Amino acid sequence: MRIIRLHHLMLTVWAMACVQLLFGQATVGTLNLTSEANQDYVLFSPNVSESTYLIDKCGRLIHQWETEGRPGMMAYFMDNGDLLRTRVHQTGQFIGGGIGGIIERFDWDGNLVWNDTIASFSHHHHHDIAVLPNGNILAILWEKWFTEDAIARGQLPELASEEVWVTRIVELLPMTGSGSEVVWSWSPWEHLIQDTDPALPHYGDPADYPQRFDVNFQAISASGGSGLGQEA
């Protein structure tokens, strides 16, 4: 109990010192600070900026990276001090919230040490990524399919859209310098159920297969087409 109280007292003193700092000089980003906050650093990449900032809870700038292009939806600080971030890359094929398209890694000095473009006519990275314990990267993509693809999987023609955006999650093995190899992937497109045509694959009663995705369940994508999607 004494240790807990002492720790709380130290946090309170630290927070008070930060408050004095906030009034004494300009800081980067800190608007509110309480004794309940931990002492971890904060990494953020403003949506309209090409800079990424590492600050302490007092708002003091610890480090800054200058990069090219608007950031995607995330930035991560690696154990060795590298910055891993996503970047917006438009191809004109996919337009939606959370769009990314490029994953890049910078060392502490701001040198680009690795990047990968995951954006084409048929697929596009969006939203978050995750670094696995083995160093590989999980990324979430949109895949583009068309009316005939959906109908061939049992979707009713009256429900079929011109484009169908389907989620795919991929595990990427980064190559030296740039690029990656897909070593694993998963998509709901491979786990469908439909009850419209017994001659087509994945026929059955959706109620009997709750682990599968009903191809006739409608979700509207940002483009106005239908989609089987997931945002991280």
Question: Where is each model-derived feature located?
Answer:
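Histidine-/acidic-rich catalytic cores in large beta-rich domains
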Residues: 24-232
